Amino acid sequence: MAGKGINIKVKRAAIIKALHDRLTEMVHIQEEYEREVEAYEKARLKWEEEVAQVTLKSIDFKTICDNINIRKGYSANNNQTNVMIDVMIDDNKLPVEPEGVKNPFRNTWSGKTYLGNYEERVAEIKNAITILNLSDEETVNTSTYANVAKYL
């Protein structure tokens, strides 16, 4: 019995409903993620402005020549010079950097199975729902269920 696989029948309607529910959940998760990314980008711009202000206030013009890097001709317009100044600032004088947002649907692997990004997963779920709706069978076999279960 150790080598014998399990064989069950799963109701097609139950799988379709579960896929619809998962699709709805994914849409809500993606919308929340997009709102969080937008808020993060605004916070990041504000943080960069604050860092620039602290940096400008921290420049010691007496010692600036020790920390200056001048490059000529590296820009698209060779009539410009790129001047970079390294300014050392204690971290405790800088504002706290906003934390990035983790993408809930980044490309990933689950064992040997590739799970794509949001768009790829939505397309796969919609495709599975379409195929399951075309079937007139009341149940589906274990292998069909296994193929769609990764999205549930």
How would you describe each model-predicted region?
Residues 49, 53, 57-133:
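Acidic, low-complexity, intrinsically disordered interaction modules
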Residues 68-70, 140-149:
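Extended, charge-rich alpha-helical interface modules
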Residues 1-38, 87-88, 94-97, 106-108:
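Short, charged, low-complexity amphipathic alpha-helix
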Residues 16, 20-23, 27-30, 37, ...:
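Heptad-repeat amphipathic alpha-helical coiled-coil interaction surface used
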Residues 14-19, 27, 41-43, 48, ...:
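Hydrophobic face of amphipathic alpha-helices
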Residues 2-4, 145-152:
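Short acidic DE-rich linear segments
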